UniProtKB/Swiss-Prot annotation:
Protein name as it appears in the record: Spindle assembly checkpoint component MAD1
Native source species: Nakaseomyces delphensis
Species lineage: Eukaryota, Fungi, Dikarya, Ascomycota, Saccharomycotina
Subcellular location: Nucleus
Transmembrane segments: none
Biological function: Central component of the spindle assembly checkpoint.
């Protein structure tokens, strides 16, 4: 109440009351300004993000639209190509018919031409069926692409409408922001007017400096924002350039692929033209060959047909088989003659060896005879000497007794008789040997002459006959070879004229076929799902529905197929895992058996990284090694007396666990009763 009546208190009316109120309003205004700026920036960022997303979607739809138009264009081009090919085939058929009508040939040749016409007609029918199928397929694809274009256009219009609505919202927000900025500027003017009433110049100077600093900061923030906007625009431009570059690169690749396909089609067309020319040349050569084989003198056989050629060829082939069999028989006979000649040569060599042995035995016997003759002469000389000695002895020992002389005479007579018997026996044996040698040599000569003459005569006769037959057969072989060359040339021409068929072998149940079948099935399901989803989107856009309560059946089928594929993959993985487990168990058992047989220990792996080791010499005793704690436990200390000493020596001091196990094995072997 004192404040209303104007009391004397100095704090009734504060000189800075209005300033505090202005500052409070200022803080509230700045807080509202920041809040509006934050909302504006958030909305602007959201608008930019949505704009970029809509631009991307618009670009994708435009790209899809261009791709659909390209596919339509390609389909039309291919339809034009098929129509042109059909027209060319019709023209070729008409030309073939005109040529067939102009060329009047034999009945068999007409039959062949008829078969060729039938083949051409079948080919034309097949091509027409293929043309109709391709045309129907391209028509359906064209309709699908039209539907897709319509859906894309509707989506583009929808997104353009959304863009317009968002741009209107942004414009309204901008107008509100401008109004708020105007209010803030008015408040700033009021605040500056009230700041002029401040008596403290130092505070005013500080406020001006702060205001300048804030202005510089605001200017710096604006510059940063502008640079960020420029960079964002540059980034957008670069992204659009990149997307356009990728699009044109893909377009270039598609064009290159089309050019490559056109080159391949042109090459195939040229190859077909060359094959047609080759067929025409072969037909003309065949006609010329038939005309040359015609016999104009004979009225009944004035035409030489292909059946006549086949008959002549079969006759020549049969003759060739007969002559080939005869030639094989002659080869066998010549081989038999060679074998007989070899046997006779072996017998001759054996006879020559026997002759040499007989001659050697004769020479040896003659040497023996000569030696016996020499011994005979020596014995006669000895007899003479003995007689002389006896006579001398007689003269010297007349006083000896007559009994001794008689004994000597008896001995001498016996010696003479024996020598005579020996000489007579030697003469008899010599005469027998000489006679036997003469008889054997004469008999062998006669036998040789008889057998050799007969064998030589027979061999000479056989050789002469075989040489004559061989010369005749060689002449026939040369003739047959010439005929065979001619027939082979004709067969080669006939084979070249025939239609060439290529068969490609393929496994019936190969993994590649399974994968391709699964991919094809998945692709068909995805295509059906895509079609149904497009139709569903069109229905939603036409009926202006906000949500979809149902899903298409194709989506369920595709998910079911993916689930089946995943189940099959799981089954395959389980089978592979079971096989790997079996292999691992088998290999681990082999490893344990090898360690047991080579090192004398059986290993048993336990939980928590422990290994139990059994010795083959004491199966009831064991060692437990903990690989995590590096500890060792055993019940072998009851058997081995110096267990602790060995453990401290080999494990604690030297750190050699293998040597420790080896010493334990030796100790257990020593303790094991044999």
């Amino acid at each position: 109440m004192d404040s209303d009546s104007g009391g004397s208190s100095p704090f009734v009316e504060s000189p800075h009351g209005e300033e505090v109120q202005v500052r409070g309003d200022e803080t509230n205004n700045t807080y509202g300004q920041d809040q509006w700026k934050f909302k504006y920036e958030g909305l602007l960022n959201e608008w930019e993000i949505q704009k970029i997303q809509w631009q991307k979607e618009k670009y994708e739809f435009e790209k899809r639209q261009l791709a659909a138009e390209d596919r339509l264009r390609n389909a039309n081009d291919e339809m034009d190509i098929l129509i042109q090919r059909n027209q060319d085939l019709v023209y070729r058929i008409e030309e073939e018919e005109r040529n067939r009508i102009n060329n009047d040939e034999g009945n068999d040749l007409k039959g062949g031409a008829g078969s060729m016409d039938k083949g051409k007609k079948q080919e034309i029918e097949e091509l027409s069926r293929r043309y109709e199928a391709d045309r129907f397929e391209w028509k359906t694809q064209n309709e699908e692409l039209d539907l897709e274009l319509k859906s894309c256009k509707s989506l583009i219009s929808k997104y353009e409408q959304l863009l317009m609505e968002q741009s209107e919202k942004i414009n309204s927000l901008r107008s509100e922001v401008k109004n708020k900025e105007d209010q803030i500027a008015e408040l700033e003017v009021v605040r500056q007017k009230k700041d002029h009433n401040i008596t403290n110049t130092e505070e005013f100077r500080n406020l001006t400096t702060l205001k300048d600093i804030i202005k510089t900061h605001d200017q710096y923030a604006l510059d940063l924002e502008q640079s960020n906007m420029r960079q964002a625009e540059e980034l957008k431009r670069l992204k659009s350039l990149k997307e356009s570059a990728t699009f044109w690169r893909s377009e270039n690749e598609q064009l290159q692929e089309r050019i490559r396909q056109l080159e391949e089609v042109e090459q195939q067309y040229n190859e077909v033209q060359l094959e047609i020319l080759e067929l025409k040349v072969n037909i003309s050569e065949w006609d010329r060959f038939l005309k040359e084989k015609c016999q104009p003198g004979d009225t009944e056989t004035a035409e030489y047909t292909p059946s006549d050629f086949v008959r002549d060829y079969e006759i020549l082939q049969n003759d060739y088989k007969v002559l080939n069999d005869e030639f094989e028989d002659l080869k066998k006979e010549t081989q038999m003659v060679k074998i007989l000649n070899d046997e006779l040569a072996m017998e001759r060599n054996q006879i020559l060896n026997l002759k040499n042995e007989y001659e050697k035995s004769i020479i040896n016997l003659e040497k023996l005879n000569y030696e016996l003759e020499q011994q005979k002469t020596l014995s006669f000389e000895e007899c003479k000497l003995l007689r002389k000695q006896l006579e001398s002895i007689k003269h010297k020992s007349n006083h000896e007794e007559n009994d001794s002389t008689k004994d000597y005479e008896v001995l001498i007579d016996n010696y003479k008789n024996q020598t005579k018997d020996l000489t007579s026996e030697l003469k008899r044996m010599n005469d027998e040997l000489i006679g036997s040698n003469r008889d054997s040599s004469a008999g062998s000569k006669k036998r040789k002459l008889r057998t050799g003459d007969s064998v030589n005569v027979n061999l000479a006769q056989k050789l002469n006959t075989m040489q004559i037959e061989n010369s005749n057969l060689q002449k026939e072989i040369h003739k047959l070879k010439a005929i065979i060359d001619v027939l082979e040339k004709k067969i080669r021409l006939l084979k070249e004229n025939k239609e060439k068929r290529i068969r490609i072998l393929q496994q019936r149940d190969s993994p590649l076929l399974k994968i391709q079948f699964a991919r094809k099935q998945e692709l068909d399901l995805l295509k059906d799902e895509n079609k149904e989803l497009l139709s569903l989107i069109e229905n939603v856009t036409e009926n202006n529905q906000n949500r979809i309560d149902t899903i298409p059946l194709s989506a369920y089928k595709s998910l079911e197929f993916q689930y089946q594929q995943s189940q099959e993959n799981v089954v395959k993985g389980e089978k592979q895992l079971s096989r790997l487990k079996q292999i691992y168990n088998k290999k681990s058992l082999e490893f344990i058996d090898i360690v047991n047989s080579m090192l004398g220990f059986r290993l048993e792996f336990m939980l928590d990284g422990r290994v139990k080791i059994y010795s083959c010499y004491k199966p009831d005793k064991y060692l437990i090694a903990n690989l995590i704690d590096n500890t060792l436990k055993s019940n072998l200390d009851a058997i081995i007396s110096d267990w602790d000493e060995l453990l401290s020596l080999w494990v604690v001091e030297r750190g050699q666990l293998p040597c420790f196990l080896a010493t334990i094995t030796l100790r257990l072997w020593e303790l094991n009763p044999i």
